Curated annotation (Swiss-Prot):
Residues with PTM Phosphoserine: S298, S301
Biased composition (Acidic residues): 293-306
Protein name as it appears in the record: Regulatory protein E2
GO CC list: host cell nucleus
PTM annotation: Oxidation of Cys-340 in response to redox signaling leads to the loss of DNA-binding activity and the inactivation of gene activator or repressor function.
Record keywords: Activator, DNA replication, DNA-binding, Early protein, Host nucleus, Oxidation, Phosphoprotein, Repressor, Transcription, Transcription regulation
Quaternary assembly: Binds DNA as homodimer. Interacts with protein E1; this interaction greatly increases E1 DNA-binding activity. Interacts with protein L1; this interaction enhances E2-dependent replication and transcription activation. Interacts with protein L2; this interaction inhibits E2 transcriptional activity but not DNA replication function E2. Interacts with protein E7; this interaction inhibits E7 oncogenic activity. Interacts with host TAF1; this interaction modulates E2-dependent transcriptional regulation. Interacts with host BRD4; this interaction mediates E2 transcriptional activation function.
Entry-linked InterPro entries: E2/EBNA1_C_sf, Nucleotide-bd_a/b_plait_sf, Papillomavirus_E2_C, PPV_E2_N, Reg_prot_E2, Regulatory_protein_E2_N, Regulatory_protein_E2_N_1, Regulatory_protein_E2_N_2
Annotated control of activity: Inactivated by oxidation of Cys-340 to a sulfenic acid.
DNA-binding domain: region residues: 325-410
Biological process according to GO: DNA replication; DNA-templated transcription; regulation of DNA replication; viral DNA genome replication
Region annotated Transactivation domain, chain positions: 1-202
Family, as annotated: Belongs to the papillomaviridae E2 protein family.
Length: 410
């Protein structure tokens, strides 16, 4: 029994060391899955012999141990095969070789280059799903491991093999619309590309969340292999200055659903657009008709009006920044590191800071592509409280922290 406890301890310690190492070498990840295999094999054998506690570790049910051991064996053997190909010299993170990613659609292949595709159903921002698509898929075939390119369009998520068989769809948004949509309408946003699609009903035009109108293409969205034509801004369609405030009014703020679509004033050029059967989601803070009347009555439409910024009041609710200035700590690392760190801080050191944000990323130039590491922002009531936090809360290896003080200009 002592030998089994020692072997279990070594296997678990090996896993922890490899996780903290954050290696990009495939051989290190093979060692990790070998250790997982050893751990669950020992636990399975112990459970079969009636042992419920091995060392300081409770032994799970034998079915759980068996399933985890099978997963580890499959991952170990697959990675060993992959390491013998030209892809073995590429950088691989532990996340790239995780079981969850390996089993995500399309299943049983390794994936890299994750990005998020947003699908909005019924033109309702609250009825939105997010799908992960990977740029590179490493797939096992009869001829060995091959690289496939993946992407998204108005029809669904697809990949293209080197054999040149065209786009192979493994998830279709039309099927998703049948589950989540009531009207059959859906729209797709992939980075800086926008697609429109219809699964069951038809509509001439749909309102886009970024202030553009996209015409529906067909019963299954865009045809395979064909990109949607670029959408035209509303201002170019109407040809009237009255449409200027539409984008400014929409912005990216959505306070709740509206019960009616946009109504353009007579003479503004809006007659070329037919009202969508799907209500537009979002709140326009200015009335377009009244704004048009004001502009028509104005003696000089080129005269600029002074911009009045909204002032903070005591009834606004929660505010991260205080009028007298706030002390901050900006903490960055991998998404999992930051998430675990925030959990430990909230659980054990809640009295040492004031507020903590959720995990966030900086957005790159192309759509919703992430750049840099995951980050959280922690606020403090005073520099002394921040100093106490830094003194008593350790920062795990691989994470970075920066301190700064910010004050409100308006």
């Amino acid at each position: 029994m002592e030998t089994a406890c020692e072997r279990l301890h070594v296997a678990q310690e090996t896993q922890m060391q490899l996780i903290e190492k954050s290696s990009d070498k495939l051989q290190d990840h093979i060692l990790y899955w070998t250790a997982v295999r050893t751990e669950n094999t020992l636990l399975y054998a112990a459970r079969k012999k009636g042992v419920t506690v091995l060392g300081h570790c409770r032994v799970p049910h034998s079915v759980v141990c068996q399933e985890r051991a099978k997963q580890a064996i499959e991952m170990q053997l697959s990675l060993q095969e992959l390491s013998k190909t030209e892809f073995g010299d590429e950088p691989w993170s532990l996340l790239d070789t995780s079981w969850d990613r390996y089993m995500s659609e399309p299943k049983r292949c390794f994936k890299k280059g994750a990005r998020v595709v947003e699908v909005e159903f019924d033109g309702n921002a609250s009825n939105t799903n997010w799908y992960t698509v990977y740029s590179n898929l490493y797939m096992r075939t009869e001829d060995g491991w091959q690289l496939a390119k993946a992407g998204a369009d108005g029809t669904g998520l697809y990949y293209c093999t080197m054999a040149g068989a065209g786009r192979i769809y493994y998830s279709r948004f039309g099927d998703e619309a049948a589950r989540f949509s009531t009207t059959g309408h859906y729209s797709v946003r992939d980075q800086d590309r926008v697609y429109a699609g219809v699964s069951s009903t038809s509509s001439d035009f749909r309102d886009r969340p970024d202030g553009v109108w996209v015409a529906s293409e067909g019963p299954e969205g865009d045809p395979a292999g064909k990109e949607a034509e670029p959408a035209q801004p509303v201002s170019s369609l109407l040809g009237s200055p009255a449409c200027g405030p539409i984008r400014a009014g929409l912005g990216w703020v959505r306070d709740g659903p509206r019960s009616h679509p946009y109504n353009f004033p007579a003479g503004s050029g809006g007659s070329i657009l037919r009202s969508s059967s799907t209500p537009v989601q979002g709140t326009v803070p200015v009335d377009l008709a009244s704004r048009q009347e004001e502009e028509e009555q104005s003696p000089d439409s080129t005269e600029e009006e002074p911009v009045t910024l909204p002032r903070r009041t005591t009834n606004d609710g929660f505010h991260l920044l205080k009028a007298g200035g706030s002390c901050f700590a900006l903490i960055s690392g991998t998404a999992n590191q930051v998430k675990c760190y925030r959990f430990r801080v909230k659980k054990n050191h809640r009295h040492r800071y004031e507020n903590c944000t959720t995990t966030w990323f900086t957005v790159a130039d192309n759509g919703a592509e992430r750049q840099g590491q995951a980050q959280i922002l922690i606020t403090f009531g005073s520099p002394s409280q921040r100093q106490d936090f830094l003194k008593h809360v350790p920062l795990p290896p691989g994470m970075n922290i920066s301190g700064f003080t910010a004050s409100l200009d308006f």
